[in-house]
Amino acid sequence: GVEFRQGETSIYSEYLKYNREFGRLEAEGGVRFEQGSDRFFGSRLRYDTTDDTGVLEAPAFLMRRKQTARGGAERLEFLGRNRLRLSGAHFTTCEPGNDDWRLEARQLDLDYEEEEGVARGARLRFFDTTILGAPYFSFPLENRRKSGLLAPQFAQSTLRGAEVGLPFYWNIAPE
């Protein structure tokens, strides 16, 4: 395999071509892209090191920020250091091996500069059952207050059976 390192970015793959003059690279075959505490895996990567933009095909990801998130997509676009766009995506904050809930979206934008996620053509699924569908909704990525739906809550009891709660938070004042 081949390894590329620059600052906090490391790329590993079977094949890698790098144009030093323009800062562009292409990698294929078992691509692993690491940036800070984020990990991305895919089949093919085109990336511009000068502005942190590029495309990763058939990605899986694990992002360890204030809240760990993981998922996959048909395609992932790097839109700068802290901005991602995923097409045909699924996303969860559940621990690996536990997919109790997940968000599926035709397009999922994650902007860690603004601490906001935006899902288009979205479905919120609980144990493979869609519990909410929305053409568009936004959600916070960090611990910032924002009016909107909160993470789903799940419970199981012998008295009531399975329960799903979808709380709504109304941020009346920014403080």
Where is each model-derived feature located?
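Structural signature for solvent-exposed beta-strand/loop edge elements and short helix-capping sites
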Residues: 1-175
